[in-house]
Amino acid sequence: MAKTSSENKVVRTVARTRKPARAVAKQPAVRRRRSSGDTPYHHGDLHEALLKAAERVLERDGLAGLTLRAVAREAGVSHAAPTHHFGDLTGLLSELAAIGFRMFNEAMNAAGSSETLPVMKALASAKAYVAYAQAHPGMYGVMFRSARLDYSRPSLHEASDAAFAGLTRGVAASRQEQISQQSLSLDQAAAIARAWSLVHGFTMLLLDGRLSDILSRLPKGTSADQLLDAMLRTMAPRPPGL
């Protein structure tokens, strides 16, 4: 019995010296350090964040540098995130172009609304067309890369259609007549195509630096904007006193 009592004391002493198992569980877990690329986004924000990242990549690196992986890196998210939201690069470019067309249309409408005379509204809208392209050359390039876009996407279809409606209104103002976008006469269609060809062609030549030679032959100080103004005025009657 004495031996048993001694053994019991040893067992009790060992038990008192052991740390409870739950004490280990209470130790704080070591957290992984967040890298700069692990930017957290709320569920509803990631789509917009990816589009903004795509805009930055486009303006900085051009269309050639705009890839799904580049956008993911810029946004600080996984490489799979852009694919999940847009499907492929065509999907991303299409959503980006939709944003461009909306901004483009807003700029033309704002410029036109600042004028009172119909002809001046048309001239102001045309100048806003060129100014937008100069301010956002990368976005403008995407908007008119039809082969890279999916016009079956509602956002792009609606935005581009609204921009065309704005162009139609500008031509209608210069002609001082009502034009139905759904039903055009041949003469009206020709007027729209002529105006669009002039402004878009001028814009592309300007962005590519192809107008430098012409501008160098004009009186010193003549700007591209003045050249555009002279071109536009040949297409519309000049209001009295202007």
Regions found by a protein language model. Give the residues of each.
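Solvent-exposed, amphipathic alpha-helical segments
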Residues: 53-61, 103-114, 198-205
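Amphipathic alpha-helical segments used for helix-helix packing
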Residues: 134-152, 204-212
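N-terminal intrinsically disordered/low-complexity leader segments
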Residues: 1-45, 56, 239-242
